[in-house]
């Protein structure tokens, strides 16, 4: 159906007589109103008025051109316009426009109404764009802006008669009767929703309904009424230019006037919430909202709204289907190309236990090649939350660089014919009463020990000089820690003897935050050395053997430190050592455990037994 834009901002479909589906039923009047709304942004408030004035000027020019074309039939139209004397008082008699002064008056009135309408539109959109855009308030402004000016109704009526000379006007008394019937029907409908309105608002709305009916008749809104006694139709809609084709609000109403539609839909539908907070993408700019509401008379109210660019291009319009008045009727359903969808993205993260298992498996697999490539290597793995770890390949390369120096500069008292690989895995033990933790030596595997240890103190100065010059122990850790104890041999730092329990408890707490540390300890050829690796900036706990010099160590990002400190050997009773040996442990393990616990044989034996406990992961 073709529609022609008019100067009042509405597009009225041109219908011929007899086209209405509700012939002979004045209560079932059907009319279609199309509103053209300009896309308004907060920064474009100064552009509203020029666009509206331009559109209405083009409208006036189009009407004047139509008047000139139909100038020959003005005399015939004046005869038909004489029947409008019986119309209500707000409809003036139709007078044909024949001179240029009346044309100027029409243009002036149109511009005046355009200014008023743009002011109202500007005020409304600026007050509603940040909070909630109410459908009711939006529609309430439209009849007031476009239909409230009574001074140009006669001109519009005359222009409509000029634009379509072949259609005749319905007698005024029938129009008045229809208006009275619709006014009474609207009053009854307003009584249904009167609990939300004040009596003053009802009276005002009733007057607006009557004025709207008369105004729509004067403006030429198509009301196809074909009673049995009259076979005439209302003049068709007037023609006016509309420069904006971006946004259309099409409102198809049945059995309701425009103001009644505003009141009913404004209370049946909740306001459009958070217009400025949501996103309306330009890819899907159109959204149709079809509301099917039923009043107590089972009358259908179809509201099809197609909106585009009412807000800035990054707003998403969401209309909740809240039905306050008629909860048992159908709620508005959202349809079209811009139906909003709620997407809930739930991020699933693996549990800490699963992550630790994976990390432990990776560390075990990656530590196997390194233990075979080195002649004397100690790998201490702290099974805790770990991310930053040093590659074992790099550790092996560091070891091989110093390996030939070790073999060439061994002391004559000690000789290793075969490589010794010590793999120490430190874990946190939470179920032991001594709180020693699994950072104690768990697995000590000696492949082959040659001649053993030498306790000859005469060779100590010579070996220490050569060691300090040419060799260093590479202790590589991914993250520095205060105390990570790897007991690998006979001697332990006497610092642990003073506060053994405090040190072990601190170690248990600190290993929780350690990353997987790979510590590569290079034996200097004097026997199995003991090392307690700490942060080099804070403290240095160096653990040599009973008669051996200290070990030099370097973190992965620093040079080998050269601050030796010789610790005196500790002597333990032979009975305690024999007791531990009879339990199935080696001499080195017995001496290391005794040094660790300060000579307490019972506690040393308990530590050695606890390291064999396997905690399921």
Swiss-Prot record:
The keyword DNA repair does not apply. Transmembrane segments: none annotated. GO terms for biological process: negative regulation of D-glucose transmembrane transport; negative regulation of Golgi to plasma membrane protein transport; negative regulation of nucleoside transport; negative regulation of protein localization to plasma membrane; negative regulation of transport. Residues 571-611 form the UBA domain. It is found in: Cell membrane; Nucleus; Golgi apparatus, trans-Golgi network. Keywords: Cell membrane, Golgi apparatus, Membrane, Nucleus, Transcription, Transcription regulation. Its main location: membrane. It comes from the Eukaryota. Residues 43-52, 66-83 have a biased composition (Basic and acidic residues). InterPro entries: UBA. Residues 410-412 are annotated as: Involved in post-transcriptional down-regulation of SLC5A1. One of its GO terms (cellular component) is cell junction. Residues 1-22, 89-103, 155-165 have a biased composition (Polar residues). The tripeptides QCP and QSP mediate post-transcriptional down-regulation of SLC5A1 at the trans-Golgi network. They inhibit a monosaccharide-dependent exocytotic pathway of SLC5A1. Interacts with YRDC. This is Regulatory solute carrier protein family 1 member 1.
């Amino acid at each position: 159906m073709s529609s022609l834009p008019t100067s009042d901002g509405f597009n009225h479909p041109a219908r011929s007589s007899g086209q209405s589906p509700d012939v002979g039923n004045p209560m079932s009047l059907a009319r279609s109103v199309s509103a053209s709304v300009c896309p308004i942004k907060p920064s474009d408030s100064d552009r509203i008025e020029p666009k509206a004035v331009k559109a209405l000027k083009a409208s006036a020019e189009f009407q004047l051109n139509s008047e000139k074309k139909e100038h020959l039939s003005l005399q015939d139209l004046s005869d038909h316009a004489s029947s409008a004397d019986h119309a209500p008082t707000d409809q003036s008699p139709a007078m044909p426009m024949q001179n240029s002064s009346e044309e100027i008056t029409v243009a002036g009135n149109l511009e005046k109404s355009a200014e008023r309408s743009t002011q109202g539109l500007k005020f409304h959109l600026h007050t509603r764009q940040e909070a909630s855009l109410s459908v009711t308030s939006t529609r309430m402004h439209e009849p007031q802006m476009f239909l409230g000016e009574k001074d140009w109704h006669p001109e519009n009526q005359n222009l409509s008669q000029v634009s379509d000379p072949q259609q005749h006007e319905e007698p005024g008394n029938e129009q008045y009767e229809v208006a009275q019937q619709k006014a009474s029907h609207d009053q009854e409908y307003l009584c249904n929703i009167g609990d939300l309105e004040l009596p003053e608002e009802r009276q005002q709305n009733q007057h607006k309904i009557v004025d709207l009916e008369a105004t729509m008749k004067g403006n030429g809104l198509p009301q196809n009424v074909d009673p049995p006694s009259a076979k005439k139709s209302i003049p068709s809609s007037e023609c006016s230019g509309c420069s904006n084709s971006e946004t259309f609000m099409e409102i198809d109403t049945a059995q309701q006037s425009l103001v009644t539609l505003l009141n009913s839909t404004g209370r049946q539908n909740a306001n459009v919430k958070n217009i400025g907070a949501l996103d309306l993408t330009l890819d899907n700019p159109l959204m149709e909202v079809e509301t099917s509401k039923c009043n107590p008379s089972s009358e259908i109210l179809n509201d099809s709204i197609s909106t585009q660019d009412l807000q800035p291009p990054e707003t998403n319009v969401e209309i909740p289907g809240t039905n306050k008045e008629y909860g048992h009727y159908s709620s508005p359903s959202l349809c079209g190309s811009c139906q909003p969808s709620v997407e809930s993205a739930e991020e699933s993260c693996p549990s800490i236990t699963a992550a630790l298992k994976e990390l432990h498996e990776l560390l075990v697999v990656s530590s196997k090649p390194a233990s075979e490539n080195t002649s004397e290597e100690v790998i201490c793995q702290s099974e805790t939350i770990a991310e930053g770890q040093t590659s074992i390949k790099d550790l092996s390369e560091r070891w091989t660089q110093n390996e030939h120096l070790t073999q060439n500069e061994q002391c004559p008292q000690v000789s290793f014919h075969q490589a010794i690989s010590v793999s120490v895995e430190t874990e946190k033990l939470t179920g032991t009463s001594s709180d020693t933790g699994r950072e104690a030596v768990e697995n000590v595997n000696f492949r082959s020990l040659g001649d053993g240890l030498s306790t000859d103190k005469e060779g100590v100065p010579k070996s220490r000089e050569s060691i300090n010059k040419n060799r260093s122990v590479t202790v590589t850790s991914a993250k520095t820690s205060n105390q990570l104890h790897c007991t690998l041999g006979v001697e332990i730092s006497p610092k642990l003897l003073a506060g053994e329990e405090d040190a072990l408890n601190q170690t248990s707490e600190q290993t929780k935050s350690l990353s997987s540390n790979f510590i590569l300890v290079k034996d200097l050829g004097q026997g199995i050395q003991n090392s307690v690796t700490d942060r080099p900036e804070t403290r240095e706990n160096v653990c040599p053997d009973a008669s051996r010099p200290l070990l030099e160590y370097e973190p992965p990002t620093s040079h080998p430190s050269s601050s030796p400190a010789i610790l005196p050997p500790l002597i333990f009773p032979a009975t305690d050592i024999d007791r531990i040996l009879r339990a199935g442990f080696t001499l080195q393990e017995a001496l290391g455990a005794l040094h660790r616990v300060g000579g307490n044989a019972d506690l040393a034996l308990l530590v050695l037994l606890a390291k064999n406990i396997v905690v399921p992961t």
